[in-house]
A protein has these predicted regions:
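Crotonase-fold acyl-CoA enzyme core
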Residues: 46-54, 64-69, 151-166, 177-188, ...
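A structural preference for short, pocket-lining loop segments at secondary-structure junctions
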Residues: 60, 83-131, 144-160, 186-187, ...
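Long amphipathic alpha-helix in the N-terminal Rossmann-like dinucleotide-binding domain
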Residues: 138-140
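C-terminal long alpha-helix characteristic of the crotonase
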Residues: 239-301
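Hydrophobic/aromatic residues within transmembrane alpha-helices
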Residues: 106, 119, 174-176, 232
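Catalytic cores of alpha/beta
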Residues: 170-171
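Conserved CoA-thioester-binding segment of acyl-CoA-metabolizing enzymes
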Residues: 2-105
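C-terminal non-catalytic accessory extensions
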Residues: 3-4, 300-337
Length: 337
């Protein structure tokens, strides 16, 4: 089984994707890795969000969204609220005779991290306060977002999870709700919750049991170790592997190569949801089990959880320092254009 020290050592950032460039979107070859500027509220009618950067690319009818977390790269309540608002916007704008939408791509701008999962600091504080209801409320907010995404917001679209950094705990769970997962080589996946006496309670078991079978799902949840993108690809969880730094290019290549069969592929994913249906009620019942289990954690368990929070804080500091070092070069490059 993985150790808490080993997991903390795994949380080391590597250079993230090419930074956002604020200029009009030209025609691009699939090999390029840039995306267009963040969308304004009037284009095509999506809200500006505090922790999610959004861009609609009309040429391919693709909506790109990237997390820009305030603080640790985890699913804080504000991030969840942003995601829910984005989902509302997508349904409103693209589900009511607006622009066509073929693809929804979701990734992260945090260097080396997709998401480290749930807000462990919040969990520890609510557990110490004996506030089980708050944990249930948080968990339900997570699975509400996940369930809507799993069903592609009831729109004829293909959802793509873009992994350019590590996806742990709830971050991994969230990815499992996408139709297609494209991951850069060397990124890590895993469920560390067992290290502090818990399990991933927001969808992991439901998704993995249907995809891998209950025995393999339990093994992956109970061993607490991290898996590479290559291992996830062998298991069929990751669909496409990309070279380091080429995740966005891989998404573009997938979209470009999928034009003629997109309609059929989208219908297949829709049919698959009917065959292996996961109800919101199932997800919420598991949240209740998770919250009840959380209330039984010991002081030692909570101390381990809080040590992970400290490791995440150090990771955030390293990422901020790296961004500060590269900011002058990015500004010079932008002015040159």
């Amino acid at each position: 089984m993985a150790s808490i020290t080993g997991l903390a050592k795994d949380l080391v950032p590597y250079p993230g994707p090419v930074p956002l460039r604020r200029r009009p979107t030209p025609a691009r070859r699939p090999s390029e890795t840039r995306i267009a500027p963040a969308v304004s509220p009037a284009d095509p009618g999506l809200s500006e969000l505090a922790q999610i950067e959004v861009d609609f690319e009309a040429g391919s009818n693709t909506l790109w969204a990237f997390m820009r977390p305030h603080g640790r790269p985890c699913q804080n309540p504000e991030m969840l609220a942003d995601f829910s608002r984005l989902q509302d916007d997508i349904e409103r704008v693209f589900g009511s005779g607006g622009p066509d939408l073929n693809y929804f791509v979701f990734g992260s701008r945090f260097p080396g991290v997709f998401s480290l999962g749930g807000d462990l600091n919040l969990f520890a504080s609510k557990i110490r306060a004996g506030d089980e209801a708050a944990l249930v409320g948080y968990g339900n907010a997570c699975v509400d977002v996940l369930h809507r995404n799993m069903n592609a917001l009831n729109l004829p679209i293909i959802t793509i999870g873009l992994v350019q950094g590590d996806a742990l705990g709830g971050g991994f769970e969230g990815l499992l709700s996408f139709d297609v997962i494209i991951a850069e080589k060397g990124t890590k996946f895993g469920f560390p919750e067992i290290l502090f006496g818990l399990f991933p309670g927001m969808g992991a078991y439901s998704f993995l049991a249907r995809r891998l079978g209950t025995i393999k799902a339990q093994e992956m949840i109970l061993d607490g170790r991290t898996y590479t993108a290559e291992e996830m690809h062998e298991l069929g969880i990751v669909h496409i592997l990309a070279e380091r730094g080429q995740g966005e290019a891989a998404v573009r290549a997938y979209i470009a190569g999928n034009r003629r069969r997109r309609n059929g592929q989208q219908a297949i994913y829709q049919a698959a949801r009917e065959v292996d249906r996961i109800s919101l009620d199932e997800l919420r019942k598991i949240v209740a089990v998770w919250a009840a289990a959380a209330m039984n954690l010991t002081d030692r368990d909570l101390s381990i959880m809080e040590r992970l929070v400290l490791a995440q804080d150090k990771l955030r500091g390293k990422a901020q320092a790296a961004q500060a070092r590269t900011a002058p070069a990015r500004a010079l490059s932008a002015s040159a254009r």
